[in-house]
Amino acid sequence: APYKDLPVKLLKLVLLTHEHSDHIKGLGVFLRKYQVPVYATEGTINCILNNKTVGKVDSDLFNVIKPDRDFSIKDIELLPLHISHDAADPVCYRFFEKEKSCAVVTDLGEYDDKLVSSLQNLDAVLIESNHDVNMLQTGSYPYSLKQRIWGNKGHLSNEACGRLLNRLLSDRLKHILLGHLSEENNYPELAYQAVRNEINFSPDKYQADNLDIRVASRVKPSCLVEF
């Protein structure tokens, strides 16, 4: 059966990137029902438990991980990587299994050479393409929120996403999923085209037509990507 039809009870653990509500909403209900282990940084865990943002949960379910230190869960090796975001101790994740590797990279206002180096030689990536700059500038958000979003601890614009991808592209990286799109300040078509333009206009040899670039839905599971 397609993975989107699999029952929730088959989920064996939870990985958290940070404590913002759009990333932990529903966590308390899920843990009270299924009691699976949760992996997150110490700062993230402390925010969740001390602020009781998820309600009453068993603190023993939480496992502390450290940025830039890998750990294993069964046959999968995971590497949490520090990111620049306005949260307590945020990370993105890189996954390794046998000869394959992928990453989930969202919620970052900027990136540095260390992060770029840590994300080389991927086979697939889900990467943030949060907003269209013009839509954000002219939209209804308060100016303070706009500053937060386009700040260095905010979110990557469509063009910034494309520029980061240009530094990650290799002969291995074929599958790109654009994610964490703003509902108010972006459209899937805008994100898709902006990222393609950044890739195609780069002096590097890679062209968007040779890549599997898709946009993740905000409301339903994306299609299965195999690599």
Model-found features: residue ranges?
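Active-site metal-binding motif and surrounding structural segment of the metallo-beta-lactamase
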Residues: 1-41
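Active-site environment of divalent metal-dependent phosphoester hydrolases
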Residues: 20-24, 45-47, 87-88, 110-113, ...
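Core dinuclear metal-dependent hydrolase active-site scaffold
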Residues: 1-6, 25, 66-124, 224-227
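Glycine/small-residue-rich loop that forms an oxyanion/phosphate-binding "nest" at active or ligand-binding sites
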Residues: 24-87
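Short, basic/aromatic-enriched C-terminal tail that caps enzymatic domains
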Residues: 211-227
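Cap/insert and terminal regions of metallo-dependent hydrolase folds
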Residues: 113-215
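Short, well-ordered alpha-helix to beta-strand connector turns
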Residues: 11, 59, 122-123
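Active-site neighborhood of phospho(di)ester-bond hydrolases with catalytic His/Asp-centered motifs
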Residues: 11-19, 39-42, 103-106, 126-128, ...
